[in-house]
Amino acid sequence: MASIAAERIDRLHTLARAAARTGDDDRAREYVRLARRLAERNRLTLPPAFRRFTCDDCDAVLVPGRNARVRTRSGHVVVTCDCGTHARYPYTG
């Protein structure tokens, strides 16, 4: 059962990115919400790429330069959504 849910989460992530590329942000948000709910109900963790490129507050698919600002600081990357939510990710280099 979990593998079916994981496949569906991957498919919803692909659909959300495609919808965001075409400018259909509402549909992309709905796909993100469905994937998060599916992961929650099946006790699955979301893939790292999914977590990194979606906003935790407004469920938007983050596209750098369009609805997200990306800044590098010493030791971490700061991604800011249009809604104002910040996410920090460590990096080495």
Swiss-Prot record:
Location of this chain's protein in the cell: Cytoplasm
Alphabetical keyword list: Cytoplasm, Endonuclease, Hydrolase, Metal-binding, Nuclease, tRNA processing, Zinc
EC code: 3.1.26.5
Catalytic activity from the UniProt record: Endonucleolytic cleavage of RNA, removing 5'-extranucleotides from tRNA precursor
Cofactors (names): Zn(2+)
Matching InterPro entries: RNP4, Rpr2/Snm1/Rpp21
GO-annotated biological processes: tRNA 5'-leader removal
Top EC group: hydrolase
GO CC terms: cytoplasm; ribonuclease P complex
Main location: cytoplasm
UniProt cross-references to PANTHER family, sorted A to Z: RIBONUCLEASE P PROTEIN SUBUNIT P21, RIBONUCLEASE P SUBUNIT P21
Similarity comment: Belongs to the eukaryotic/archaeal RNase P protein component 4 family.
Name of the protein this chain belongs to: Ribonuclease P protein component 4
Encoding gene per record: rnp4
